[in-house]
Amino acid sequence: MEETAHELTVKQYVEQQRELEREAREVLPYSFDTCTYSMGYLKQPLYACLTCQKASGSLNAVCYSCSISCHADHDLVDLFNKRHFRCDCGTTRTHSIPCNLRKSVDECGSENDYNHNFEGRFCICDTVYNPETEEGTMFQCILCEDWFHEKCLQKTNKGIAIPDAETFEWLVCSECSEKYRDHLLNQKHESIAGTERAPLFLSENFRENLCPCESCISLRNLEMPMLVAEEPIYEPPEDSEDGISEMNEDPSESGEMIEQVISSTMNDVLRILDRLPRVQANESVYAYNRLKSELTDFLTPFARENRVVTKEDISNFFLERSRISKNLR
């Protein structure tokens, strides 16, 4: 029988499922099975949970893993990297609901700092960030870690257009340049922030030009260590592909190998889909999970004989399943 647009062998079906799995791994490249709470205070990717804020009345942020494993169906704001922060999942700041990964409720991080970013608002304009409608580039201040619109930076820069993004590596916002002027002394002991309030646009090697005297180094180490050395950023380990079975390329091999791949691939795909962040179709995923066993049993004979699966075969499978379901009511 010649294959049509509606026909495929089980092996081809499995290959299609494996491709979907690879695409899912590209969306979620990191493992999300470990909460960072026990690691203490880190510079790490964070997500503010607005849903838990409404319930607890407290600002919060959760780590990458918890944003997926514990807060996937909540209203989250991507805060990107924030320094010296301990995950708030499973604390009073997230309504004292146990973390799904730690299975516990613990004390919230007393050293965590919060600003208007944790409410979903950014920049001196205090605008709610919407990634779907946001236009233009935003830049993060190396000191306060707030994000600023290019047009707003220009306003604080006496109306002068900011330098091309390719010409600087770091931003110090106008408020921080004024607040931390004494931390930004050059080798002549003059503040690189100048005397007027304005943003600073620093090169990658700006630290080499800061004052090296013992007093200045001590001050920076004590209050602004990010001016001394670039901070390490925690990243979750990459999700391994151990769960992806190797396809048997030899069609003459026993169909049992393909049958095993079907089962393995279905489990892998379901596992990834079930854990995708903020997926709105969870009910469909769970329904598909219940179908796995029946569908595997149905496809096994096709796999063993390397037969094509037609659209009619699949339709008959679901019609029969529907008939049985009605008889059981």
Curated annotation (Swiss-Prot):
One Gene Ontology term, aspect cellular component: nucleus
Zinc finger UBR-type: from-to: 33-104
Keyword Nucleus appears in the UniProt entry: no
Zinc finger PHD-type: from-to: 120-179
Record's keyword terms, sorted: Metal-binding, Zinc, Zinc-finger
Top-level taxon of origin: Eukaryota
Keyword Zinc: yes
Pfam families listed in its UniProt record: PHD, zf-UBR
One Gene Ontology molecular-function label: ubiquitin protein ligase activity
PROSITE patterns found in the cross-reference section: ZF_PHD_1, ZF_PHD_2, ZF_UBR
Gene Ontology biological process terms from the UniProt entry: chromatin remodeling
Role this protein plays: Not known, interfere with mitotic chromosome segregation when overexpressed.
Family as reported in the entry's similarity comment: Belongs to the UBR7 family.
Name listed for the protein in its UniProt record: Protein mlo2
Organism: Schizosaccharomyces pombe (strain 972 / ATCC 24843) (Fission yeast)
